[in-house]
């Protein structure tokens, strides 16, 4: 996923949505193809996962941009992880609660600064690959346990 995600945006030939969400195809396709190689997935499930990833990217991107970039964050790195987690969650058939947890975990993988713009670094090429990996790592965390905050301490329980 890291290699395919990096390659998907590395040559700057990928899709682009200028009102938010960056490059949803670059964050969706590597993840759903990797999961489809590991389990049986129908064409309809692939398309549904792709559409869900695009939709998540557009909605989250529109909510965060342009402020995200003016604060120094690369939109694809920050939003792409949610795109990837949503697409992976659809392929893995997560229920709404599991998807919520996957997206919450994806938030911890979100990041990537625009420093490459100032220094000419090539790390930008890696941002989408890292977003794909973060989204993929976020989604399998759907075990039947739940962590919540009590009044004074964190308590994890199993159902």
Across the structure, where does each feature detected by a protein language model lie?
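N-terminal core-entry segment
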Residues: 1-158
């Amino acid at each position: 996923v890291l290699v395919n995600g990096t390659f998907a945006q590395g040559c700057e030939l990928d899709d682009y949505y200028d009102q938010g969400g960056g490059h949803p195809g670059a964050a969706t396709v590597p993840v759903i193809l990797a999961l489809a190689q590991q389990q049986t997935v129908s064409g309809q499930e692939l398309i549904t996962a792709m559409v869900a990833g695009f939709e998540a990217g557009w909605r989250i991107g529109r909510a965060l941009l342009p402020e995200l970039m003016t604060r120094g964050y690369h939109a694809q790195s920050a939003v792409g992880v949610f795109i990837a987690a949503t697409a992976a969650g659809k392929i893995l058939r997560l229920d709404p609660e599991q998807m919520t947890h996957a997206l919450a975990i994806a938030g911890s993988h979100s990041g990537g600064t625009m420093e490459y713009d100032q220094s000419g670094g090539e790390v930008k090429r890696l941002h989408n690959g890292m977003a794909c990996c973060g989204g993929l790592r976020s989604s399998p965390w759907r075990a039947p346990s739940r962590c919540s905050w009590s009044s004074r301490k964190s308590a994890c329980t199993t159902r």
